[in-house]
Amino acid sequence: MRDRSTRRLQRLLGGIAVAWAVGSVSAGAQQSPSGPLTLSDAIEAALKNYPAIKERRARAQAAEEDVNVARTAYLPRLDFLFQENRATTNNVFGLLLPQSIVPPISGPVLGSRSYDSVWGSAAGVLLSWEAVDFGQRKAAVDIARAQSTAARAQTVLTELDVASAAADAFLTVLAADESVRAARANVERLQVFADSVRTLVSNQLRPGADQSRAEAELAMAKNQLSQAIQITETARATLADAIGAAGAPVELTVGPLATVPDVNVEALNAKNHPAAQFNQASIDAVRARQQALDRAYFPTVTFQSAYSGRGTGAEVPGQPSLGSGAWLQVPNWAIGATVAFPAFDLFSINARKRVEAQNVLGESARYDQTIQTLTTQDVRARALTKAAVDIAKNTPVELQAARDAESRARARYQNGLTTVTEVAEAQRLLAQAEADDALARLGVWRALLATAQAHGDLAPFLAKVRQP
């Protein structure tokens, strides 16, 4: 019997240890929160300070700016150029394939191979505007918008995860504090009992084995108290990390969490969950890329207008000299239109379409998996809520019975009607009942939090928390 109760308490402490052990990586200590924190304060601090949220918001804003970047493709392009050079004037007939190494030379063939050089200059301005693209730029803007929507959805999902983690860490600290209180009360009772047994043994009214057993029980209770305190301190560190104030001391106020709330769980609409909306936005982004590929195999029409001037120090036989060439001497202007069509891009475009088709299937499968996971989480949360409510209704009965049993066991021992073993077992049972009663109320709140997280909206949960 004693071993079974001890194992129950150890499992309780172990469960709390597992709860606070799962946390996110923090980016460094933040400013210590001022005053005791309520659960709402903890969530607000997490949404304000947690680095992961700041990162997501910045990336979402960057994705929004990408839409503006895509829109700039509608604007005309204006390029300026000025060039000054000194070079030889030797020229030949013949073709030169397009490349970027050998500089071209304009003018007649002079038949010279001299290394004499002259000055040359050039300047110009070119105005280009892609007037017709058959929807290619609009498709690029649609891609940017879809990616921006996905980034915003991911930000909302991150906010939900961070807020839920902060709330869970808050409840974990409260549960750990209740375990400490129960363990400390058990130590105090066992201390009083051990002193009483010591007096009885000194008066030779009880055997010395009773004193040894009482002191052993007291030592075990003190060890359990030390373990509970360790778990509490570590849980507080996890909470500080969850609210973006890693390393800062945090003090909590229980507020309405000390009572059992009314439970009314709404039906799940998985499509409205931020995780589902993010997956849907990812599907839309892939489909936007598909639509862009549908517009890729079309020509583009570009209007161009240029004005330029050149100067050269080279002399052509029979022609008047134009000067030293250090400055512009011969002007030119041009206006026209260019139609460009990438004929052989058909093969790469078709290959990319096949890639995006598979990406749509993959993103759709992930969306279906998310809906299935959310549905399962909702079923589990409902089962957890029902069990938590039933336990919260039963623990007061357990606590009162344990108190009566402990009081009667002590009275029987004082009158010599039972052994120290029965008293020790009754006191452990009372310690467990006290912890169960305190944790049962928090268990209902934790179940409501799990339900709200499964539904993707913490507002109903926070409304209950803020109720007077």
Please report, for each region that a protein language model flagged, where it lies by residue:
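Short, glycine-/polar-rich solvent-exposed loops and beta-turns at beta-strand/coil boundaries
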Residues: T72-L75, V162, P207, Y297
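Small/polar-residue-enriched beta-strand and adjacent coil segments characteristic
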Residues: P36-T38, R77-L157, Q277-R289, A296-T370, ...
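Bacterial N-terminal signal peptides that target proteins for export
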Residues: R2-G15, W20
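Acidic, low-complexity, intrinsically disordered peripheral segments
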Residues: R2, Q30-S32, R86-T88, A381, ...
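C-terminal segment of classical bacterial N-terminal signal peptides
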Residues: W20-G28
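Amphipathic alpha-helical coiled-coil segments
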Residues: E55-A70, T158, V162-R181, V192, ...
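Periplasmic alpha-helical coiled-coil/stalk elements that build and connect Gram-negative outer-membrane
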Residues: R2, T158-N272, L384, A388, ...
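Bacterial Sec-pathway N-terminal export signals of envelope proteins
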Residues: A29-E84, T89-V92, E130-A131, G247, ...
